[in-house]
Amino acid sequence: MSLWDKAVPVGERCILELPLNYTKHDHDVLDKIFRVANNMKNNLISWYDRQLTEMTRTRAWRDNQKSLSNLYSEYADDVEDLEKGKQRIAKKKENAKKKKKTFYLSRKDKEQLRYLQSRVKEFEEKRKDLYEIRNEMIHRYGFSKFDFEKQMNKYRKSYGTLVGIDVAQKIAYSVWDMFQAVLYGKGKSISFSPFSKFLAIEGKKNGANITFNKDKMTVTLGMKSNKIRMRVKKNRKDPYGYETEALSRRVCYCRIIRKAYPKGWRYFLQLVLEGPPPVKVNPETGELLHSMGKGRVGLDIGPQTLAFSADKEVGLEELAEGVQLAQNEIRRIKGSMDRSRKNSNPKMFTADGQVVRKNKLPAECLNCRGQRIWVKTNRYKKMEILLRSLYRKQAALRKHLHRRMTNRLLAMGDEFYVEDMRWKALAKRAKETKRTKKGKILSKKRYGKSIANKAPAMFLSILEQKVVASGGSFQWIITWKAKASQFSHETGKCNKKKLSQRWHYLADGTKVQRDIYSAFLIQHTNKNLESFNLRTCAKDFPAFLKMHQKEIERLQSLDKRMPSSMGIKKAA
């Protein structure tokens, strides 16, 4: 189902991934199907990219966009003032209710509110007319879902019986989503699909194109002469009954995916099943393998580390600890590939290693379309395959480590509180140019590499999904109001600290690790999610301090390198 097709209801679903047992002929057919499907996708993108360019160049489109821009500029202040006025009135009502007083709105406020409401209504009516004109143009140039299906069917027929109608339509929906994001969402441009990044094809139902047979444990793919049937491997042991429970569900549709390995692509079957994910059960005791605990858990997550505080345990851990080793290997291979490319294409680079612009390249370095002709050695091609394999291994390891950590946290409590972080903003480079006292320009880098390697947002989404599925609660506290990293429960005030200051000092001189202390405060968040309960903080702090000291001693005794953001030094 398309992301933009809001009319079609989708129930809760889960995915079971199983390896395929195929011959060399089957592998060749699968490779051919994926290549053709990717070509069809790029053909559709190319067609609609031209349609989009043609539409946006018309005078009617430009006039409509200009009118919309002017309309938003004219009424922006009124819309903002109305929203602020409503918030202010709601706050006054709440304060009056607390003081058990009757709330009255002054005549001046009433007149101002009526004026703003009339302005906003006028704005909405004008906007509606302009958007109707815009949508009519979009429909006229063939940007409806049906038009995408129709155009894709033309490409499908030209490739014979390799790709079924359901698979082709699903590819068309993915392209439609891309253009919908550009026309209605935050999308800026459309990119073509490289074959190395085209990793999945799927049907719309289990009865056509890609069909799974539960009784024979086989999957059928393709049409007529290109039809292949492959056996699906099942875990015969299945100690926790996960696969058995999953296969008892109704299959909504099937998906064939491919993964990069050092010796080439391997293909797998993904079954999209009805209902929530099965739970793993210990066969000896009959209890849940990862059961949920009781109590509050506070989390303070950073680009590389995770601090947690529960009733019986506190801790500070590095996120996805083993991922950095894979990243080091990726960096080494990228360096080798870069040197190989420079040696094989000397005319493409300047003496200092910069890429030469196209307009300054000799004719033999460009093809008939004006694109660069890169010479790739056999060793370079092998390194490309190895690099894809390493990225796949790194992603799988990262997800495995995140899931293992979430299972550990799940046993600590059933109420989770975490700061609402904006990872996209943290990953961006700084806009302002800063200099040292000596005039040297400081680096604009922030946390882009750490966030890409450790994927803290993915960890939180996995944790939230597991907590909610297990019947617990997952709350996001208001970071800019709570200010956990600056707050002190002793004074009840905020004291701004430098980023390099990794320890919080108490009135008696005792020091606590900054992230662990923040997790402790987050654990004791009030119901409004923007302040802390000082009474429970004072009550639970002595027990927390003992657990904190134990955790610091454990970290200091470890014989490994830790992120500098932890502020932990090895014991002498």
Question: Which functions belong to the PLM regions below?
Answer:
Residues 57-70, 189-209, 353-362, 485, ...:
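Amphipathic alpha-helical surface "interface" segments used
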